[in-house]
Amino acid sequence: MKLITNGRLITRDASAQGYYEHGAVAFEGTKIVEVGEEAALRAKYPGAEIIDARGGVIMPAFINAHTHIYSALARGLSIVGNNPTNFYEVLDGTWWAIDRHLMMDGTRASAAALYIDSIKQGVTTIFDHHASYGEIPGTLHTIAEESKRLGLRSCLCYEVSDRDGEEKCLQAIQENADFITECEKNKDPMLAAMFGGHALFTISDKTFDRMVAANNGRTGYHIHVSEGMNDVYDSLQNYGRRPVQRLQDHGILGPKTILGHCIHVNAAEMEIIKETGTMVVNNPESNMGNAIGICPVLQLHKRGILLGMGTDAYTNDMLESLK
C-alpha cells in the first residue's frame, strides 16, 4: 500500500467531497483504494509507503486525446525557405517535410521526449497519431516499447495518407493492421490501437476502402476532419460530399472513432456525429497557432456530442491549452 500525502486533493467527485485541504490518496498497484483526509488515511494504513506531494495539488491525471509524437523534437525548428502563408503550406513545408525524413531512431527519441514531458505535465494517457514516412514498418511497436518503459497508457495509430504514393500508403495501412493484431494478442491494459488516417483531402475513396478492409471492424479510427477549409473544399469538389458525410459513407464513424479538430463542420454534420456517437477532440492552441479557426465546442456540447481535448503536440501542458 502507498499513500500520496501533503497535498491539496481535488477528487472531482460530485457525489461526495470534491476537495480536501489536507488530502491523501491510498493506492495499491494500479488501483486507487481510498481518498480522504490525510490524518485519517495515515491512521488507517500505518504501514503504507509515503509519497510526499510537497504541498502540491493531487488530482486526476490528464488525457491528451490528440497528439503527434513525430513532432516532439521539432519545437523551435526553422526550415530554410519555408515561409507558409496558409495551412496547406504549413503541412507541406513543415510537418510532411519532417515526417518524410523520420527514421526508427528518430521515432524512438521523439516518443521518449514526448512521454517524459507528458509525465512532467500530469498527463498519463495519450492518443497518438503518428507519421514517419522515412521508415514505416514497426514504428508503432517501437513507440509502444517507450510507452511501457516510461509507464504511460497509450492508444496508438499510424497516419494513412496518399500523399507519398501508393507503396507508402499500403505500408501505413499494414502498420495499423499489424499493431491492432499485436494489441489484440498481448491484451496489455496500458496499450491500445486505433486505425489512423491523415485527413480526407489526402485519402481517396480507394484508400478508405482499403483501410476499412484491413481494420475489419476491430477498432475505431483516428482522423483529422475539417481542420482547414481546404479539407471541406476538396471533399465537395472531388466527391460531392462534405467531410463528415464522406466518412459516414465509408463506415468510419462510430463510438470508437475520434475526429480531430472539426472546426469547419456544419449543423448537418454535427447531427451525423451525434447520431453515430462519434467523439470530437478540440485542439485550441494548435488551431490558434495555425490560424485556421475555432472548433464550435459549445454547439457540439449542446448536441450531446462527446468532447475531448488534445494538444496536437504544440505542447504537452494540458492546462496551457485549456487556457
Enumerate the predicted regions with their spans.
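Histidine/acidic-residue-rich catalytic or RNA/ligand-binding cores of hydrolases
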Residues: 229-241, 269-274, 291-300, 315-323
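Active-site gating loops and adjacent loop-to-helix segments of metal-dependent hydrolytic enzymes
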Residues: 73-107, 164-165, 229-256, 276-279
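His/Asp/Glu-enriched, well-ordered alpha-helical/loop segment
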Residues: 249-256, 298-323
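Metal-coordinating catalytic core of metallo-dependent amide/deamination hydrolases
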Residues: 130-263
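N-terminal metal-binding scaffold of metallo-dependent hydrolase/deaminase domains
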Residues: 1-44, 56-58
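Glycine-enriched alpha-helix->loop->beta-strand junction motifs that scaffold or abut catalytic
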Residues: 151, 215-220, 252-255, 272-281, ...
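Alpha-helical scaffold segments that flank or form the walls of functional sites
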Residues: 77-129, 134-152, 173-187
